[in-house]
């Protein structure tokens, strides 16, 4: 960590999480002067411990993959999904094409610190314990940020000017919430997460190639789902995600029956009661498992922004959008946004395109990646909230294998990172999502109606009003990955020293 924040830099990155560290690392490798400000001092705790295999090519691009392989994190060979107690769990196999396609279950404090230190090794000037107080904009161009005021816990403060800004400030989303005011929450995914850590837990499929895969299970009362993620430090992350109104209802019920228990005790009772509604998870915990530490909770609201870029700034990661964690998409979307931010800034600096074209590319790229996961998650929630209805399976099927295979390009992150994914495979996934979310007579009879939230997602750059009403429209013509996916007539040139955009 460097001592004194400089007075100026080429590129200023706010936030040292995966989106910020990655964008900074990519830009530093391109020879730009990059300063990164992080309000915490790493390592620091963070939830979001499961990765997708699509992260590997991103990490490989900055020579970070080998560090991950050698660090000791548990390899994640796939993920098991139990959506109905009467049917066998589904499984998405990351290693079907070889063991090197596995992802990892990570302790985020360690992973984030490792990535931030790697960025510093690549030339990023990292300053921790620095809080951004205010962003200043150009007097000649009111939407262009040109400097910011910062402060530290010891009372020191100052200003730093820059030519380009990457806002990767996490859910605080400084640009989006404080200045642009363009954040919108998805009404159907206003959830609450409660979690803690256990020791002595079992493993899913021990002794097989599926061992250490996380387990995700729908609660039997159709109010949410639970996760079970084994970690290399001997702990297992176990959490529950509930709709906000259901969480409030359950807490009120437990409080009424609590006989004077404290609020934390009531919350723990709710947590344990919900775990009992995931019998497969309880079986994995086993009789020797012990809850350690304290219970944690957080609002788990899904949100997005109307734009993720503007004159000389980009927004990446949770600073711009967040989607329900059912498919562990957080780090994937952070790296996607980080690389897009870096690529479009480099493109604008190098004259590959206009700044307006670079901004449009970045906003479309982030929106497309977010919307892919949004529609798959909405389909999963439709099944969770109506488990006896054939949403993701046919009546005669005893499993969800067909559905999971259909959704593979999205839930493994391939749609954004796999150069071998064919357009036909992606189109098949999109068609499946449409069939799940389309209204029909059977869905009208569901006990718990589900608002898809489609109206919350704005489809930009659409040729007609009809297309704009269909958030999937923007995904139909996508190619395969960063290096070949054409957006608004451009694709990314993935070559170190020449990173930027190329006109298709």
From Swiss-Prot:
Melleolide sesquiterpene aryl esters are cytotoxic secondary products with anti-cancer potential. Armillaridin shows therapeutic and radiosensitizing effects on human esophageal cancer cells. Armillaridin induces autophagy-associated cell death in human chronic myelogenous leukemia as well as of hepatocellular carcinoma cells. Armillaridin can also inhibit the differentiation and activation of human macrophages and thus might have potential to be developed as a biological response modifier for inflammatory diseases. InterPro entries: FAD/NAD-bd_sf, Flavin-dep_Halogenase_NPB, Flavin_halogenase. GO terms for molecular function: flavin-dependent halogenase activity; monooxygenase activity. Pfam families: Trp_halogenase. This is Flavin-dependent halogenase armH3. Keywords: FAD, Flavoprotein, Monooxygenase, Oxidoreductase. The gene is armH3. Its EC number is 1.14.19.-. Chloride binds at residues 329-330.
């Amino acid at each position: 960590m460097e001592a004194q924040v400089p007075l100026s830099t080429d590129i200023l990155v706010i936030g040292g999480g995966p989106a910020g560290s990655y964008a900074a690392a990519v830009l530093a490798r391109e020879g730009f002067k990059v300063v990164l400000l992080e309000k915490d001092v790493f390592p620091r705790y963070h939830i979001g411990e499961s990765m997708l295999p699509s992260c590997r090519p991103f990490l490989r691009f900055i020579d970070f993959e080998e560090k991950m392989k050698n660090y000791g994190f548990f390899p994640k060979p796939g993920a098991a999904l139990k959506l109905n107690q009467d049917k066998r769990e589904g499984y998405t196999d990351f290693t079907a094409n070889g063991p090197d396609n596995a992802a990892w279950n990570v302790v985020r404090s360690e992973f984030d610190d490792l990535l931030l230190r790697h960025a510093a090794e690549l030339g990023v000037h990292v300053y921790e314990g620095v809080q951004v107080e205010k962003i200043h904009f150009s007097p000649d161009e009111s939407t262009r940020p040109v400097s910011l005021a910062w402060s530290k816990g010891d009372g020191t403060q100052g200003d730093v000017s820059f030519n380009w800004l990457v806002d990767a400030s996490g859910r605080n989303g400084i640009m989006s919430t404080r200045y642009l005011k363009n954040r919108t929450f998805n009404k159907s995914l206003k959830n609450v997460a409660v979690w803690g850590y256990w020791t002595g837990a079992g493993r899913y499929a021990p002794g097989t190639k599926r061992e250490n895969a996380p387990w995700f299970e729908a609660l039997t009362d159709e109010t949410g789902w639970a996760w079970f993620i084994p970690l290399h430090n001997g702990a297992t992350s176990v959490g529950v995600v509930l709709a906000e109104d259901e969480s409030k209802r359950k807490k009120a019920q437990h409080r009424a029956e609590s006989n004077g228990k404290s609020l934390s005790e009531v919350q723990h009772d709710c947590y344990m009661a919900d775990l009992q509604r995931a019998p497969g998870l309880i079986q994995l915990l086993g009789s020797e498992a012990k809850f350690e530490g304290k219970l944690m909770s957080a609002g788990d609201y899904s949100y997005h922004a109307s734009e993720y870029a503007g004159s000389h700034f980009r927004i990446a990661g949770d600073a711009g959008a967040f989607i329900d964690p059912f498919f562990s998409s957080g780090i994937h979307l952070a790296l996607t946004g980080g690389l897009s931010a870096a690529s479009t800034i480099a493109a604008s600096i190098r004259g590959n395109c206009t700044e307006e074209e670079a901004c449009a590319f970045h906003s479309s790229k982030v929106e497309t990646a977010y919307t892919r996961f949004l529609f798959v998650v909405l389909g999963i929630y439709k099944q969770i909230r109506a488990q006896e209805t054939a949403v993701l399976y046919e009546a005669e099927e005893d499993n969800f294998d067909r559905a999971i295979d259909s959704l593979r390009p999205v839930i493994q992150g391939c749609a954004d990172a796999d150069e071998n994914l064919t357009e036909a495979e992606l189109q098949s996934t999109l068609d499946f999502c449409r069939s799940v979310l389309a209204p029909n007579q059977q869905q009208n009879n569901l006990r718990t109606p589900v608002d898809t939230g489609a109206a919350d997602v704005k489809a930009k750059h659409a040729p007609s009003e009809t297309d704009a009403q269909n958030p999937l429209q923007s995904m139909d013509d996508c190619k395969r990955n960063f290096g070949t996916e054409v957006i608004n007539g451009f694709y990314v040139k993935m070559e170190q020293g020449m990173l930027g955009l190329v006109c298709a």
